[in-house]
């Protein structure tokens, strides 16, 4: 039975109403600092923890609740006579309900101007200590770390003479340990990220222990396949341009595959500064184009592979206006992503309520690491964020690319980074002409890319080709030249580079090397 509660929260949403309801149920309220003032100003009878313990807050508030009268009242087992006798001897009442959430460490370190000093001051000490004490003694103490649980606790108290069930206490305690683990992990990750800087080291040091913490956004209907269960989680610190920040304007619930493909499309389209459209199917771009506006870019992107675009994901880096919306509405599309949709575009899609419209701000989308699970382990690497500049390219053939060819090569190279390896991409005039993806041999990707262009009725004469990794033999080069390519961009680095460059000279095409590989698995 809950007779006394201690409330100390950073997130004050709903706390006044919750405390009023507790008071109406006859529960005495202890509190600290800003929370105590808020509750008192709302007309509630509140006892400051400093008055309760007889010991003042000290060290600029660093020591508030670290006192035996607080932790004894939380940790004492009510079923052990010796524990209760100890409380009586030292005049320590029980604390039956603890309502605490922690200093906003993650929000603090997410700010660009955050200093190490700011971060340190936002490491909560008393809060986690009380939470862990209450969660450990969950048989006797109800502990609430999430405002979403206020209503559940009140409903049970009202129905059971101020008592909360063991089942609920156990669930809330489990939530606490997940929360404190997440909190400590965020602190560890932040401090680890500063290690090299503080040691004046340029090494890319990875932590000895890698902590992951994500909040669940929603359960999904199923995973990659219907027999797999799934859920979507959001990083604690989400960059402004991340897919996880989407605002869904309309449409059915997103599926596992929708989310994965949407991320691929969104990250690709954001790499372009001019109006662009990216169409993705099964995590691979099947059409990418630049245009005068969203409508123009979409019309070009669709030409690459209209068959594969059916039921795909479409992303724009400009507002979708009425013209673009009317064009897209003519085909079956799963998800449409853009920084914004005009009112007229929204009206067009109002007649197609199953189409999922996602608004996401332009900006950085991923944090520092790329993660991949393997059996019993985790692969961690930095993001593939390298974009080569024209001055970094090395022309290795007798013929140099023309300015137009160089523009097409750089466009093709940017697209190839987002195509599953082995990747071959034909481009021309700011649009993809044929995409060969995910083949075990590079020459097969080249053949598929040329076939795709042929099927779409697109000419490859004078086209530019990007290969995400080097040509191990000249055969792949021979295929793209036979299809019509006049220039090629690739990393180089093969034992047979001389043979491949010689073949390029033999065909009188231009070849540039990036020195950068873009494998994507």
From Swiss-Prot:
Write out the entry's keywords from A to Z: Hydrolase, Multifunctional enzyme, Purine biosynthesis, Transferase
- InterPro entries linked: AICAR_Tfase_dup_dom_sf (IPR024051), Cytidine_deaminase-like (IPR016193), MGS-like_dom (IPR011607), MGS-like_dom_sf (IPR036914), PurH-like (IPR002695)
Q: Where is the MGS-like domain?
A: 1-145
Q: Name one GO molecular function term.
A: IMP cyclohydrolase activity
Name the SUPFAM superfamilies on file: Cytidine deaminase-like, Methylglyoxal synthase-like
- Report the record's Gene Ontology biological process terms: 'de novo' IMP biosynthetic process
Q: Which GO terms describe its cellular component?
A: cytosol
EC numbers listed for it are 2.1.2.3, 3.5.4.10
Q: In which pathway does it act?
A: Purine metabolism; IMP biosynthesis via de novo pathway; 5-formamido-1-(5-phospho-D-ribosyl)imidazole-4-carboxamide from 5-amino-1-(5-phospho-D-ribosyl)imidazole-4-carboxamide (10-formyl THF route): step 1/1; Purine metabolism; IMP biosynthesis via de novo pathway; IMP from 5-formamido-1-(5-phospho-D-ribosyl)imidazole-4-carboxamide: step 1/1
Q: Which reaction does it catalyse?
A: (6R)-10-formyltetrahydrofolate + 5-amino-1-(5-phospho-beta-D-ribosyl)imidazole-4-carboxamide = 5-formamido-1-(5-phospho-D-ribosyl)imidazole-4-carboxamide + (6S)-5,6,7,8-tetrahydrofolate; IMP + H2O = 5-formamido-1-(5-phospho-D-ribosyl)imidazole-4-carboxamide
Domain comment text?
The IMP cyclohydrolase activity resides in the N-terminal region.
Stored NCBIfam families: PRK00881.1, purH
Q: Which family does it belong to?
A: Belongs to the PurH family.
Put simply, this protein is called Bifunctional purine biosynthesis protein PurH
The gene name on file is purH
């Amino acid at each position: 039975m809950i007779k006394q509660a201690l409330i100390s929260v950073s997130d004050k949403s709903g706390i006044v109403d919750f405390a009023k309801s507790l008071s109406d149920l006859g529960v005495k309220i202890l509190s600290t600092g800003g929370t105590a003032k808020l509750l008192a100003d709302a007309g509630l009878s509140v006892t400051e923890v400093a008055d309760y313990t007889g010991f003042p807050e000290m060290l600029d508030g660093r020591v508030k609740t670290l006192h035996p009268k607080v932790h004894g009242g939380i940790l004492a087992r009510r079923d052990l006579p010796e524990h209760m006798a100890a409380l009586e001897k030292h005049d320590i009442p029980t604390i039956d309900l603890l309502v605490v959430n922690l200093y906003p460490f993650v929000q603090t370190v997410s700010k660009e101007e955050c200093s190490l000093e700011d971060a340190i001051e936002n490491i909560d000490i008393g809060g986690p200590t009380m939470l862990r004490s209450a969660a450990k003694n969950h048989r006797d103490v109800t502990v609430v770390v999430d405002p979403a649980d206020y209503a559940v606790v009140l409903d049970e108290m009202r129905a059971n003479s101020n008592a909360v069930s063991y089942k609920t206490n156990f669930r809330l305690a489990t939530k606490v340990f997940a929360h404190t683990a997440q909190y400590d992990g965020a602190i560890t990750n932040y401090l680890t990220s500063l290690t090299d800087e503080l040691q004046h080291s340029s090494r890319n040091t990875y932590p000895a222990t890698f902590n992951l913490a994500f909040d669940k956004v929603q359960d999904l209907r199923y995973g990659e396949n219907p027999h797999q269960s799934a859920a979507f989680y959001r990083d604690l610190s989400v960059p402004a341009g991340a897919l996880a920040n989407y605002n869904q304007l309309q449409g059915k619930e997103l599926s596992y595959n929708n989310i994965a493909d949407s991320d691929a499309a969104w990250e690709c389209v954001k790499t372009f500064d001019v109006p662009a459209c990216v169409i993705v199917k099964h995590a691979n771009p099947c059409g990418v184009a630049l245009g005068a506006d969203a409508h123009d870019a979409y019309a070009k992107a669709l030409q690459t592979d209209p068959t594969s675009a059916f039921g795909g994901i479409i992303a724009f880096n400009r507002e979708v206006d009425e013209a673009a919306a009317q064009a897209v509405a003519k085909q079956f599309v799963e998800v449409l992503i853009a920084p914004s949709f005009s009112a007229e575009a929204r009206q067009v899609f109002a007649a197609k309520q199953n189409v999922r419209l996602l608004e996401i701000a332009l900006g950085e989308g991923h944090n520092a690491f790329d993660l991949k699970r393997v059996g019993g382990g985790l692969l961690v690497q930095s993001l593939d964020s390298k974009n080569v500049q024209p001055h970094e390219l090395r022309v290795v053939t007798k013929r140099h690319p023309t300015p137009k060819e160089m523009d097409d090569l750089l466009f093709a190279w940017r697209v190839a980074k987002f195509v599953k390896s082995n990747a071959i991409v034909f481009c021309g005039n700011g649009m993809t002409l044929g995409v060969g993806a995910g083949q075990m041999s590079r020459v097969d990707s080249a053949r598929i890319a040329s076939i795709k262009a042929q099927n779409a009725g697109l000419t490859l004469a004078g086209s530019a080709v990007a290969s995400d990794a080097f040509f191990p033999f000249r055969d792949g080069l021979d295929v793209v030249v036979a299809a019509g390519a006049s220039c090629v961009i690739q990393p180089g680095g093969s034992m047979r580079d001389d043979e491949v460059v010689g073949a390029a000279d033999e065909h009188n095409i231009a070849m540039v090397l990036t020195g950068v590989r873009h494998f994507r698995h």
